[in-house]
């Protein structure tokens, strides 16, 4: 092999190795930032289709209803804990239902209340008295009575509909246009 061909082969080889290293680093970074969505029953029993359960220390999103009477606030600081249950209809909470305790330190959203649907982002941990729990870094409450995130609507067995205008609203929009 002549020197020019060797040099070209070395350049192409180093470029391919560089692309491989960069691709590996990008995939590693993306895998660290993925938050999979689970309901309380999927955390305790696994997903229906695959049986997939989250592992301890994994970052996840959990959605469900705040169980009435489960909210406990620490009077000394902003720590709060509450239990989440599935959004099954009719809404009846039994002790036998799969529930997950969420621990959060911070200011809760204004719309947060018992019996309300929420989504929490955090890490799956295990606390001896409560079992599987979430150390939440963020808690989101739903906006109004009719709004439900697509993930929660799917978990509750409801269809997620986008907001639409009624015929009356469309008619008034046409007549009020300039």
Curated annotation (Swiss-Prot):
Topology Cytoplasmic: residue spans: 1-8
Q: What is this protein called?
A: Cytochrome c-type biogenesis protein CcmE
The Basic and acidic residues compositionally biased stretches are 157-178
Q: Which gene encodes it?
A: ccmE
Q: Please report the organism this UniProt entry assigns to the protein.
A: Colwellia psychrerythraea (strain 34H / ATCC BAA-681) (Vibrio psychroerythus)
Q: Which residues cross the membrane?
A: 9-29
- Protein function: Heme chaperone required for the biogenesis of c-type cytochromes. Transiently binds heme delivered by CcmC and transfers the heme to apo-cytochromes in a process facilitated by CcmF and CcmH.
Membrane topology value: Single-pass type II membrane protein
Where does this protein reside within or beyond the cell? Cell inner membrane
Protein residues bound to heme: 143, 147
Family per similarity comment: Belongs to the CcmE/CycJ family.
Q: Which InterPro entries match?
A: CcmE, CcmE-like_sf, NA-bd_OB-fold
Ranges in the topological domain labelled Periplasmic: 30-178
What is a single Pfam family found in this protein's UniProt entry?
CcmE
